[in-house]
């Protein structure tokens, strides 16, 4: 395709050397013209625009109607054709054609071609003569010279014109064009070298990035993460560690998703301590543990006398975390009115204390966490969509323990080491004990595994923990209702869920799962042992487990059980469950 420079691509102003009268070539004008051309070629810019500007300047001191620069690749295929002398309104048929036969002869021979009348020359085909507008009544002269890079012909520089003067003028212009072609050749060489270097740089960059991804985080960074308390080498955890290393390098807001007990606070702290904010404060707050009025004061602070009991001014968590990281756990539990207040702080990084009109600006990185399905909450208008998008800039899904079983022995030994250190014991884990742990689903994830190890170690009378020491081997493990309930084993906190219609809510006794052990095949209890004594016991344990998981917040427990808060309150009274106060 022929490139015709638009008005925006043409130089704003070029000095126009004095043109010699026909037949009287001026050395001064030629030298001035070549000097100006060299300045154009040395200026940065796209090659096709640069060549078009060269041809435009060439018109000012060489008699020509049209000028062409044709470049070819290593296979001899036309790579770029730049033209001058055609108006933008010229018939496309002429603007996109070149005298092919003549150009091929120049490339093949590597010599200049000078013709006083193309109509009388066999080097020009009928198509070439038509392109140049030559006929028996209109003679057209043609000059073409090769463009070389080193010793290789890479293109041609050609002009045509209505002949005026003697043939010596053709020879003079041919020598002049040869000098211009030589300068163009040097420019093309530099452009190709630069393009080759840039392409190689991109290839090297892609290769290095791929190696970085394949190798994962450097050993030093992995060791640092292990020091933060993240233990394991399973594929699922390794993938998470790689993301933690990458995320820690930025200041983006992070949303940690995952079931309860998967270590969201531990991951948040690891991100903070691996970031440039590591020496700044790491402040945490459980949003579900406080009423809305207290939550606002905790996050934003308050002035003296702002409310009853505010005997002095107090900084909020945002102020305390300035230049550091604020970890907001259970963010899915905050009310819609408070969501709007939090959104403003996340967007503007500014707020007012309770009881004050003074705006405080902070620099805080927020890491939020939830085990709730926020997509479902947004669909039900329980969670603001704009806040969802604000906190979910970089979502990280923490794998449940059942998806990283190879980490169970490492975690169990670490928890036992911690227990021994705190209690002056020297217990060990037998192989049979590891087999028991590996067969369990652990719906409470790492937290449940830690509790299991601590409980078993506390009750162990020997010097080592064996299979029979575990509660599940004695028919006393009641985690089965947790695993079978809707909120465990069936729910992916990272995937959207369908809303539960009110008519689908069924009383507890009708939804209780059949009693069975949490452990996988290979019964741990003696034959005939009753693990759960009837549906009533299972119902009570389901309610207790849901209340404990929700921090004894009835509304949250109701969501876990698929019931209404009123039904949960009835179940608490029915089974005589005492509500724990914090």
Swiss-Prot record:
Q: Where is this region: C-terminal DNA-binding domain?
A: 540-582
Where is ATP annotated to bind?
A: 258-265, 321-330
Give the compositionally biased regions (Polar residues).
1-11
Pinpoint the GAF domain residues.
46-188
* SUPFAM superfamilies referenced in this protein's UniProt entry, alphabetically: GAF domain-like, P-loop containing nucleoside triphosphate hydrolases
Q: Which residues form the Sigma-54 factor interaction domain?
A: 230-458
Report residue spans for region: Disordered.
1-28
Q: What are the boundaries of the region Inter-domain linker?
A: 459-539
Name a GO molecular-function annotation.
ATP binding
A cellular component annotation (GO) from this entry? protein-DNA complex
Which InterPro entries does the entry mention? AAA+_ATPase (IPR003593), GAF (IPR003018), GAF-like_dom_sf (IPR029016), HTH_Fis (IPR002197), Nif-specific_regulatory_prot (IPR010113), P-loop_NTPase (IPR027417), Sigma_54_int (IPR002078), Sigma_54_int_dom_ATP-bd_1 (IPR025662)
Locate the residues binding a divalent metal cation: 472, 477
Q: What is this protein called?
A: Nif-specific regulatory protein
The organism is Bradyrhizobium diazoefficiens (strain JCM 10833 / BCRC 13528 / IAM 13628 / NBRC 14792 / USDA 110)
Q: Which gene name belongs to this protein?
A: nifA
């Amino acid at each position: 395709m022929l490139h015709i420079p638009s008005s925006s691509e043409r130089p704003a102003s070029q000095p126009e050397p004095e043109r010699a009268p026909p037949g009287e070539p001026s050395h001064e004008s030629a030298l001035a013209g070549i000097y100006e051309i060299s300045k154009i070629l040395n200026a940065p810019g796209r090659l096709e625009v640069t060549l078009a500007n060269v041809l435009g300047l060439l018109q000012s001191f060489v008699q020509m109607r049209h000028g062409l620069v044709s470049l070819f690749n290593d296979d001899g295929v036309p790579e770029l054709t730049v033209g001058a002398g055609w108006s933008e309104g010229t018939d496309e048929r002429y603007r996109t054609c070149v005298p092919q036969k003549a150009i091929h002869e120049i490339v093949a021979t590597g010599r200049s071609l000078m013709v006083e009348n193309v109509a009388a020359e066999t080097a020009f085909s009928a198509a070439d003569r038509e392109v140049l507008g030559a006929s028996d009544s209109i003679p057209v002269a043609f000059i073409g010279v090769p463009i070389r890079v080193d010793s290789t012909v890479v293109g041609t520089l050609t002009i045509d014109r209505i002949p005026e003067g003697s043939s010596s003028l053709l020879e003079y212009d041919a020598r002049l064009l040869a000098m211009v072609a030589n300068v163009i050749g040097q420019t093309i060489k530099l452009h190709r070298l630069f393009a080759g270097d840039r392409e190689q740089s991109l290839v090297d960059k892609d290769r290095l990035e791929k190696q970085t991804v394949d190798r994962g985080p450097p050993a030093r960074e992995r060791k640092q993460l292990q020091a933060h308390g993240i233990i394991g080498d399973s594929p699922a955890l390794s993938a998470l560690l790689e993301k933690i290393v990458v995320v820690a390098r930025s200041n983006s807001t992070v949303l940690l998703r995952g079931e309860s007990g998967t270590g969201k606070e531990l991951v948040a702290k690891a991100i903070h301590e691996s970031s440039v904010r590591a020496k700044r404060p790491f402040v945490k707050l459980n949003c579900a543990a406080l009423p809305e009025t207290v939550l606002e004061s905790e996050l934003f602070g308050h002035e003296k006398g702002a409310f009853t009991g505010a005997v002095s001014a107090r900084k909020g968590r945002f102020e305390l975390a300035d230049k550091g990281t604020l970890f907001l756990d259970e963010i899915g539990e905050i009310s819609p009115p408070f969501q709007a207040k939090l959104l403003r702080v996340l967007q503007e990084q500014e707020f007012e204390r309770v009881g004050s009109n003074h705006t405080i600006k902070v620099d805080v990185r927020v890491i939020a966490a939830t085990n709730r399905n926020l997509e479902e909450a947004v669909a039900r208008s329980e969670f603001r969509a704009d806040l969802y998008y604000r906190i979910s800039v970089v979502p990280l899904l923490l794998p449940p323990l059942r998806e990283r079983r190879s980490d169970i022995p490492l975690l169990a030994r670490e928890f036992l080491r911690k227990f021994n250190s705190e209690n002056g014991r020297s217990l060990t884990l037998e192989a049979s004990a590891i087999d028991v742990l590996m067969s369990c689903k652990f719906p409470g994830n790492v937290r449940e595994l830690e509790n299991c190890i601590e409980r078993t170690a506390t009750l162990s009378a020997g010097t080592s923990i064996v299979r029979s020491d575990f509660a599940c081997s004695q028919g006393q493990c009641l985690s089965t209702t947790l695993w079978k309930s809707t909120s465990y084993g069936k729910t992916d906190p990272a995937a959207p869920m369908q809303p539960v219609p009110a008519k689908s809510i069924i009383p507890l006794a009708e939804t209780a799962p059949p009693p069975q052990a949490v452990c996988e095949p290979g019964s741990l209890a003696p034959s005939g042992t009753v693990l759960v004594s009837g549906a009533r016991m299972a119902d009570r344990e389901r309610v207790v487990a849901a209340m404990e998981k929700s921090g004894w917040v009835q509304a949250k427990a109701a969501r876990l059980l698929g019931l209404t808060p009123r039904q949960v309150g009835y179940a608490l009274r029915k089974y005589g469950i005492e509500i724990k106060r914090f």
